[in-house]
Amino acid sequence: MLASRFESPWFRNYVKSKLRTDPLYPTVWEELKGTTLPLLDLGCGLGLSAFFLRHCGFEAPIVGIDYDEPKIYAAQKIAEQFYPGTTFCHGDAREGIPDYSGSVIILDILQFFEEPEQRRLLESAAHNVASGGRLVIRCGLRDQSWRFRITYFGDHVARATRWMKAAPSCYPTREFLCEILENAGLEGDVRPLWGKTPFNNYLLSYSRP
């Protein structure tokens, strides 16, 4: 049902494939289902994470930000019709993120930022995590595995087909991410999250005590 709400056949097929093969969305729900705080979705794309959370019963306000205008337009159109309390805005996280108090998700976008930009984004996101809130991140981590090589290739294909507006510029390491989040006073863990995909994706789930 969720995929059918997108007018574009390309978007519909993409959503169907993601929901069928990617464990990201039910995993994010498991991380957030006990919270009642507002949610900020940085790099929200088509809004799929927000819409999935709504279907699962997440009731707090959700704000999504992305710099891909066609995706934001499609997401906002669906939100206005079906999902009250869900808002999508055009914006570039490189230029800063709004002050927010709640939980934050950053899914599959960090590799498109240079390392100093990653640090600024993560420090800002961590600052916006309220007491009892969560910061949930998924990204491809840089290591020596075959999965990382496939991840690198896949991201360049996404750019070549214009699905993504930029090519990847810097894949973070686990140590780099954990250091930033822990220095910001958050506590959490890191675990693999690749499901039926060949990509080197990991989930970082952190909270503020």
Please give the residue ranges for each predicted region.
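Conserved beta-strand/loop positions that form the S-adenosyl-L-methionine
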Residues: 42
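A conserved beta-strand element that flanks and buttresses the S-adenosyl-L-methionine
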Residues: 105
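Class I (Rossmann-like) S-adenosyl-L-methionine-dependent methyltransferase catalytic domain
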Residues: 1-37, 46-97, 116, 136-209
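A short glycine-rich, Lys/Arg-flanked "PGG" loop and its adjoining helix->strand segment in the class I
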Residues: 119-131
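Alpha/beta-hydrolase fold active-site loops
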Residues: 101
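Short catalytic micro-motifs in class I SAM-dependent methyltransferases
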Residues: 108-109
